[in-house]
């Protein structure tokens, strides 16, 4: 939870009062007093299973679920599995006789992860704030307006990564060599794109747009 409150004033004639008596100021301009409240929530569950066969073959499977109040109601939960496999070839009989090789392992894995960067606590909701003061029937009245363009369909940005690699150790692991290739793809990327005003109140709208891939050694 994040809360805040701040006032400002102008025209305090006595410096001895400082901020201890803001009421002594000659004026308190509009916009000089404000407050905020944010209460985003995140719930997570996770499970993991590891299995090793003959001290040679290893399997690890995990699943994570994250639920956030910052995305749309239809996309609250994101589920992110991962799996990895490895083969310790040094445990094979046909390789044990090679004394110079102390380690030789092949491994591969796949996993998904989620990201909410760029989404504030209430981006999916239609929220308002004070805009100014106008006179209504000779009385000052505060007007209200939208804080930002809301998007109730926001969802998790997701990255999927696959990798395959090998580890080689020589001469009692005095020399260790590692080679790895990876490929990752990000989908439903969060991006603030240009929109017309009107019908929108502002010229930017945050949405899940596009994808991006990376690969390398």
Question: How would you label these PLM feature ranges?
Answer:
Residues 1-217:
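Extracellular/periplasmic, surface-exposed regions of secreted and cell-surface proteins
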């Amino acid at each position: 939870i994040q809360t805040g409150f701040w006032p400002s004033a102008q025209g305090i004639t006595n410096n001895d009062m400082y901020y201890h008596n803001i009421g002594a100021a000659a004026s308190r301009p509009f916009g000089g007093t404000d407050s905020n409240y944010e209460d985003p929530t995140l719930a997570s569950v996770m499970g993991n299973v590891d299995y090793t066969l003959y001290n040679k073959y290893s399997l690890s499977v995990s699943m994570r679920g994250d639920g956030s109040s910052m995305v749309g109601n239809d996309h609250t939960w994101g589920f992110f599995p991962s799996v990895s496999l490895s083969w310790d070839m040094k445990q094979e009989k046909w390789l044990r006789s090679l004394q110079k090789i102390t380690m030789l392992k092949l491994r591969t894995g796949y996993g998904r992860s989620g990201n909410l960067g760029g989404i504030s606590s209430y981006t999916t909701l239609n929220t308002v704030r004070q805009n100014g003061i106008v006179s209504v029937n000779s009385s000052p009245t505060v007007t209200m307006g939208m804080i930002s363009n809301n998007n109730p369909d926001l969802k998790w940005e997701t990255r999927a990564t696959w990798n395959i690699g090998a580890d080689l150790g020589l001469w009692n692991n005095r020399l260790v060599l590692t080679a790895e290739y990876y490929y990752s793809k990000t989908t439903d990327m969060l991006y603030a794109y240009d929109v017309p005003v009107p019908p929108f109140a502002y010229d930017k709208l945050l949405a899940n747009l596009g994808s991006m891939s990376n690969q390398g050694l």
